[in-house]
Design a protein with these regions (language model features):
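Structured-RNA-binding interfaces characteristic of tRNA pseudouridine synthases
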Residues: 1-262
C-alpha cells in the first residue's frame, strides 16, 4: 500500500530535501527512521527538492509498504515524531491510491519568502533582514504582474542546472505585510500604515519551480523596490534576460515551501 506524509522541517540542519552522499538531508532522515520503525528498507519520494537552508511547512512525500501497517496511522505519526530530530515534524500519515505520486502528481506548489527591515532577534532565523531602509512595495507588486503566466524563466534559474525545460506557469505572485507571532511580546510598535510595516512576505505559486528561482525573483524585485529598476524591467528579464541580468539571490533561510496541491 502507498501512504502519504505531510511534514514540516527546519532547513538549517540539512543540505536540502534530496539525499546527498556526504551531508544530512531530510529524505535520508525520514527513510532511516521509517526503515527502523517498519523493519524493512523504505524509500521516500518527496514533492520536489529544496535547497540548503530552505524550510518547509507543508511538504508532502509518499512511501510504499507491503500490506497493512503494523500499527495505526496515528501511532506511526506519533512514533515517527518521537524518533525524528526536532527539526522535522510529521503531521499526518494517510493511505492514498497506488498511483498517487508526491512529485509527479503535484499540480501546484507555493513558496513564501519573509523579510524584515529592522533588527529583530525574534525573526532573524526565518526571515531575511533587508538592509535597504526604503522599499516601494507598490512598485514591487506592480512588477509581479509580469511574472504571471507561462514563460521561460531561465533568467531566474541557477546556471549549470540540467533540466529539460525552463518553462513554468506562475499563478500568483505578491508582497504583503504581516505581523510576526512574537510581535505581541516584542518591545516595538508596528505602524498602522501597511507601507511602513517592517515585516513583509512574498508569496508565489506555480506548477513547478526551477532551482534557485524564487530567491532570484525576490532579489530582482528588491531591485525594483529600491528604485534601481522599473517594474517593466521584470517584463524585459522574463522575455529576454539571462541569469546575469537579474538580481542577486537572497539567502535561503527565509524561504518556505508552504503548500503542495494535487
Amino acid at each position: 500500500m502507498r501512504y502519504s506524509l505531510c511534514l514540516s522541517y527546519d532547513g538549517a540542519e540539512f543540505c536540502g530535501w534530496q539525499i546527498q552522499p556526504s551531508a544530512p538531508s531530510v529524505q535520508a532522515v525520514l527513510e532511516s527512521t521509517l526503515s527502523r520503525l517498519l523493519n524493512i528498507p523504505v524509500q521516500v519520494t518527496g514533492a520536489g527538492r529544496t535547497d540548503t537552508l530552505v524550510n518547509a511547512s507543508g511538504y508532502v512525500a509518499h512511501f510504499d509498504y507491503p500490506g497493512e501497517l503494523p500499527f495505526g496511522q496515528d501511532d506511526l505519526c506519533y512514533k515517527l515524531n518521537a524518533m525524528l530530530p526536532r527539526s522535522v515534524a510529521v503531521h499526518s500519515v494517510t493511505p492514498v491510491p497506488d498511483d498517487f505520486h508526491a512529485r509527479f502528481g503535484a499540480r501546484r506548489r507555493e513558496y513564501t519568502y519573509f523579510i524584515h527591515r529592522k533588527k529583530d532577534p525574534f525573526v532573524r532565523a526565518y526571515s531575511w533582514q533587508c538592509g535597504y531602509p526604503v522599499l516601494d512595495f507598490d512598485a514591487m507588486n506592480n512588477a509581479c504582474r509580469y511574472l504571471l503566466g507561462k514563460h521561460d524563466f531561465s533568467c531566474f534559474e541557477k546556471t549549470g542546472t540540467d533540466v529539460k525545460t525552463s518553462v513554468c506557469t506562475i499563478y500568483e505572485a505578491f508582497w504583503k505585510p504581516y505581523t510576526p507571532s512574537l510581535q505581541s511580546i516584542a518591545p516595538s510598535v508596528i505602524s498602522s500604515e501597511a507601507e511602513k510595516s517592517p515585516y513583509w512576505y512574498f508569496r508565489v505559486s506555480a506548477d513547478r519551480f526551477l532551482r534557485n528561482m524564487v530567491r532570484a525573483i525576490v532579489g530582482s524585485l528588491i531591485e525594483v523596490g529600491r528604485g534601481k529598476q522599473s517594474p517593466e524591467w521584470i517584463e524585459e528579464l522574463v522575455a529576454h534576460g539571462t541569469r546575469g541580468d537579474a538580481g542577486e539571490s537572497v539567502p535561503g533561510h527565509a524561504l518556505f515551501l508552504t503548500k503542495v496541491l494535487y
